[in-house]
Structures are given as C-alpha cells and as structure tokens.
Amino acid sequence: MGLDDYVIACRSYKWANVFPHKTYRMLAHNALTDRLYIFVANQEEKHLYEHALHGLPYKQIIVGEKGGANATRAICHFFPVGQRILFVDDDLARFFTFSEKGEYTKDAKNLRRYIEDGFETIDKYNLGAFTFSFLSNKFYLQGKPFKEFRPFMLAGNFFGARNNPAMITTKLSHNDDAVRSVRYFEHYGGVLVYWWGGFETHYGQEEGGLQASGSRGSAAETLHKTKAASNEIYETDPLIQAYAKPPQQEKTNPFVTIKFKTLPQIRKAQKERGAPVRHARWSKWWNTKPTEAEL
C-alpha cells in the first residue's frame, strides 16, 4: 500500500450489531469496503465486530483506544505520515448528493469519485483537507459552487487528508472539529468543501456508537463538562482565540461549544497573523480547474 492509495479509517464503539447497517452498509453500497480499517476500543470489541462482520469484506479491525480524540490518535499512529486517509465515524447511514441540475439522490453510489477528486485536488493545489457541507436543503445551497476552498468546519465524522498527526490529533474530543479546522485555516487558508453532498446521520438519536465513547452523564453534568472543556480550549489555544468566538451554550441542548467567527472576521485574523488568505471555486461539476482562484 503506497501513500497515495487512500485508506478508510472508521472509529466505532459498542456498535458491533448496528455498524453493518450504518457506515459499513453505506461504504458497501459505494464499493469501498476493501479499503476499510475499523478502529475499536479493546480486544473484546474486536471479537464482537469480527463476529458481526463475518463473511463480509473489510481490510482490518484494529484495537485502538476509547474516546473520539484517542481513536483519531490511534489512527494517525497506525498509518505512516503522509498516507492518504479518509476519516469516518460509525453513524453515516447514507451518502446523498445533488446533480448539477439539482436532482437529489438520497442513497448515492458515487462516493468513490468524490474521494478520488478530493485527494487529487488537495494535493494538486496544496489545500490540506476536504469534507462535505452535509446540507440537504436546496434553499441554503442557492448560489453555491460544486466545491470551494475556504474557511469551513472540517467535520470530524468525515474528512480526507494526508496523515499529519500535528494537524489532525487533538487533546480533547469535545470541539475537536473546531480545533482541527483552525489549524488548517492557519496553515493552508481553509479546507476544500463539496457543497452539494453529505451524509445522513442520527447522531444523539440512538444508543451506542462512537458518541457513547465519551458519555458525559446527566444534562447538568454535560453542561458542566462541556463548559469546562470549551473554556480550557479557548483559554489555551491561540488559533481558537483568533478564529473562533468565546464558548457559548447551545440554544436547544445542554452543550457548551465553540463556533467560528464570521468569514470576514476570519479573513481579517488571517491577514493580521500572516496566515495564507486563499480562495477557489469550482462552479461546474467535476471541472479540474477552478472557475475562480486566488491560490
């Protein structure tokens, strides 16, 4: 396996019986299971997943560590630096897309083409990482190009990048998406986002899965723990201070999270810090050259 042969690394926890019907099914639907490495928390979990996936194709099941951040660290340590890795979580039920004509496909089968295009594009233009917008409402997608390089949240449950532990691993699981994203803002200027596609997930709606690997207890305990974690990150990470707002509680649940500043504020911070201010848009589907570019 060469560094340019991408692998798919999935973090999963206590979902041996459900996993075959979630991310595994989605990958099988897209003929991608031959690249799949599954990272579980312990040896007992490994046996359960082997039993649940008996007779089904996959590359390997590896005992990593419990917890989102720890599992990501185990993935980065398992593969060589520079390896093309697609990081996925265990709750990706379906891959959906829109065609250039706006036709919606709920359970698409062309994820491989996006992955290959993503790795080729970030390597060709030195863009660092790619993800999807996860937006399925056309109203919010009006005027968006096929793909775009800009500051954007690098979703922890699906992103592709060359293995670089210093960029990818985080101390804490909470807000790891934001911590990882701002590193790419600082080093590359943003991330590559495919606007017209994403994944159906049921995060927080079902028992088990990777989400359960960092259970925070009751609503009051969750509020306390996420507030403490968010404050620690904000107070100790200068990149978070530069590109994100102070921690705030979510309106609809007992979570304290970190959200990014507005795009103009992020661009201003990049200029002040001497970070690259880069942008590109690919308006047409599958064009190899950007329609607009400041790279």
Model-derived segments and spans:
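Hydrophobic beta-strand segments of well-ordered beta-sheets in folded domains
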Residues: D4-C10, T33-F39, Y58-I61, I85, ...
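C-terminal catalytic/acceptor-binding lobe
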Residues: G2-V7, K14-K22, L172-H174, A178-L295
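Short, well-formed alpha-helical segments that are part of the catalytic scaffolds
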Residues: V7-D34, E44-L53
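Short, solvent-exposed loop/turn segments at secondary-structure junctions
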Residues: Y13-W15, G67-G68, D91-A93, L135-F139, ...
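Active-site-proximal specificity loops/subdomain of glycosyltransferases
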Residues: F39-V88, A93-D107
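Conserved catalytic core of nucleotide-sugar-dependent glycosyltransferases
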Residues: F95-E186
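Well-ordered, non-membrane alpha-helical segments in soluble/globular domains
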Residues: P20-M26, E103-E120, T222-N231
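A structural signal for short, well-ordered beta-strand segments and their strand-loop junctions
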Residues: R84-D89, G128-S133, V191-W195, A242-K245
